[in-house]
Amino acid sequence: MEKTKPAAPSSVPRHVAIIMDGNNRWAKKRLLPGVAGHKAGVDAVRAVIEVCAKSGVEVLTLFAFSSENWQRPAEEVGALMELFFSALRREAKRLDENNISLRIIGDRSRFHPELQAAMREAEAVTAGNNRFILQIAANYGGQWDIAQAAQRLAREVQAGHLRPEDITPGLLQTCLATGDLPLPDLCIRTGGEHRISNFLLWQLAYAELYFSDLYWPDFKHEAMRNALADFASRQRRFGKTSEQVEAGARA
């Protein structure tokens, strides 16, 4: 991919979502075990956080572990859980020092109680920070998210607090795991695959999609800046024509 200039501040996405793909293939290419790729990917996470925070991005959501990833070999899943646990303990202080708030979305019930406790602790330590929000999607699936939002609304209807006809797309959106945050403007997937893999299905309705052939451990500062620059070059129409968008920009 050719080098491009960094995005101008006025065209920086408020919310960037990333599907971090390619860790296993990165490791396999180097004749290493899969977990080595996941460990190497932590450096890419740090690099992307740094670029996003400095560029004015408000929210970064990383797809760390999908609800379908439990189907992977037990050894790999176990290694991922250990890596997640150690990263939470190690990185929470670093995030707090940089005024970054950590949030974790997804169904936590399947995680070990110690890991759940580490999640709560890391969130609590960084809760008061306001420079930037790092959101980790763990045991998350877009279909699960929509279903749990529908269940919340159904309980409100059942309790007599809400009429079915009052349920709107906007109301349902507030019940999603990301309900209090801006919708993603840009979704990046690394690793050369062109799909969104059950990630933020509702939220990505109007997001710009950016696909990189780089494996996640190789997606660092320059790659992230290139993605932001590509976003800045696009015209977001939200169903309108180019002429309408341009006229609105001139008004």
From Swiss-Prot:
PROSITE patterns: UPP_SYNTHASE. Mg(2+) binds at D21, E208. It comes from the Bacteria. GO terms for biological process: cell wall organization; peptidoglycan biosynthetic process; polyprenol biosynthetic process; regulation of cell shape. Its cofactor is Mg(2+). The keyword Transmembrane helix does not apply. The keyword Transferase applies. It is an enzyme of class 2 (transferase). The active site is at D21, N69 (proton acceptor). It catalyses: 8 isopentenyl diphosphate + (2E,6E)-farnesyl diphosphate = di-trans,octa-cis-undecaprenyl diphosphate + 8 diphosphate. GO terms for cellular component: cytosol. Keywords: Cell shape, Cell wall biogenesis/degradation, Magnesium, Metal-binding, Peptidoglycan synthesis, Transferase. Catalyzes the sequential condensation of isopentenyl diphosphate (IPP) with (2E,6E)-farnesyl diphosphate (E,E-FPP) to yield (2Z,6Z,10Z,14Z,18Z,22Z,26Z,30Z,34E,38E)-undecaprenyl diphosphate (di-trans,octa-cis-UPP). UPP is the precursor of glycosyl carrier lipid in the biosynthesis of bacterial cell wall polysaccharide components such as peptidoglycan and lipopolysaccharide. This is Ditrans,polycis-undecaprenyl-diphosphate synthase ((2E,6E)-farnesyl-diphosphate specific). It comes from Pseudomonas putida (strain ATCC 47054 / DSM 6125 / CFBP 8728 / NCIMB 11950 / KT2440). The gene is uppS.
